[in-house]
Amino acid sequence: MREKYLDVLKKHNIKYFYHFTSINNLDSILENGICNRLYMDKTGIKYNYTDKNRFDNQMGCISFSLDYANKSMLLYKQKRSSNDWVIIQLDAEKILTNFYDKIYYCKYNASSPTVIKILNNNKNYLKTIQAFNNMFDESGKLNFQAEMMLEGNVSCEYVQKIYVDSLQTKFIVQQLIEDNNYKNIEVIIKKEMF
């Protein structure tokens, strides 16, 4: 079954998943991985909300964008916060290889009325290969709000790069990476992603 999910990645040439967060959460992420809110609350991990309301009500999940970061959602979050933000790039193939059956594949933003209705009435459908295929339209394009929600947590072994929007933020992130003994995570200034 796993191979079918990996085939969808290959068919659409998806190599990366993206997760954006406040830079204030990065030290915790480098120490604990990208963790869901339920786990962080239970274990006492400190974090800054990136989605205080969480209208999809999936507290046990973490969210990823496919192929590119959800720029409109990031801009929305940036306007409501004075924090600097980072975009974490993860290896899509490795994530799907290990978590394909723990992911909800949402054609639209998970807090949209369409997805919330499915989450309330037929949640398991969103874990199917059909739901993953349905994220793409007939021409192979994703809705700009499409997202995946992974039940559980993801360690930093899947992190490849961290994108920032300034040299100052790059220095801060590089220091955090060094403090947490990671040598294989690259930090890149890429303003157009923000």
Regions found by a protein language model. Name each.
Residues 1-63, 70-194:
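Active-site-proximal loop/hinge segments that shape catalytic or ion-binding/gating pockets
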